[in-house]
Amino acid sequence: MKWTESYTVNAHDTDINDIVSLTGIMRYIQDCAHCQMAGEGPSYDKLHSQGKAFVISRLAVSIYGKLYAHDKIKASTWACDSTGVSFNRCYSVERDGKKIAEASSIWALLDTASGRLIRVSDFPNNYCVDEPLELDMSSHFRLPADVPLALVGERTVEYQDVDINGHMNNTRYGDILCGY
């Protein structure tokens, strides 16, 4: 079963060509997951009050079409079967019934006081569960050792990047990645 929310795309989530950025898409799917957590429990705020935080480990996003300012969209999210300390979650974004984007993610649940990871089996929740997505790009890949890497820039994490958990919100990574 999937949790779905309806949105109108904000103009501030678009670029110079009026196309929604990767970060914009990430914001809608994150908000949808936040709504699911609030509706089914435990909520993001409840986790925060318990000294727990979900931290992203891996994210794969496939974008099949463009979104523009003021488009009416539906974002869906669902938890997937998870084991160990890896919490799996998937997302989709549709406009007029057409799939525009999909994402698959792996999260860790952290005890913020001790820094210890919390096992799936030690985290009771009511989040709806459905089948995982099969994306055209796996969230598990390694760069070959012979690929040359070079520093292309540096970025300081600023106040507006940081969320309630005291770390850079995962939706900011899209802007950083696309900015270089």
Give the residues covered by each predicted segment.
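Hot-dog-fold acyl-thioester-processing enzymes
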Residues: 1-56, 102-104, 111-180
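Short coil/turn motifs at secondary-structure junctions
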Residues: 12, 82-83, 94-98, 108-112
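Hydrophobic beta-sheet segments that form the core/acyl-binding groove
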Residues: 59-96
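"Short basic amphipathic alpha-helical interaction patches in structured regions
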Residues: 89-95, 106, 119-123
